[in-house]
Amino acid sequence: VLSPDDKKHVKAAWGKVGEHAGEYGAEALERMFLSFPTTKTYFPHFNLSHGSDQVKGHGKKVADALTLAVGHVDDMPHALSKLSDLHAHKLRVDPVNFKLLSHCLLVTLAAHLPAEFTPAVHASLDKFLASVSTVLTSKYR
């Protein structure tokens, strides 16, 4: 459960991401594909090379979903319901992949926002991404 301080940290950090959200989303995906090559199996039709339009496009989708989650942090299950359905029933993404992408997002944010990425912000973002992952996997049961 996110505390009031966690929510404050997440909103402030995501506010700093701002217009770079899509770029950071794509970078996190590239990190995931390089660090965890088995994740590529969910994107057989993508050009996964550095800077590809498909990776950039999906990175923007990831960032947009996180922006939605930040904006509805008190009601993420409702806000992310359609996305949860998509990943559980159509795409059938193994839930472990959300943890891998979350890790890569944290690394990306730490690299781009070193001054803002304090231990408290890191912990809050980690809890937030874990909450998003829980919501996205809630319909797998």
Swiss-Prot record:
Alphabetically ordered keywords of this record: Acetylation, Heme, Iron, Metal-binding, Oxygen transport, Phosphoprotein, Transport
Tissue localization of expression: Red blood cells.
Binding site for O2: 58
Residues modified to Phosphothreonine: 108, 134, 137
Modified residues (Phosphotyrosine): 24
Family: Belongs to the globin family.
Function of the molecule: Involved in oxygen transport from the lung to the various peripheral tissues.
Protein name as catalogued: Hemoglobin subunit alpha
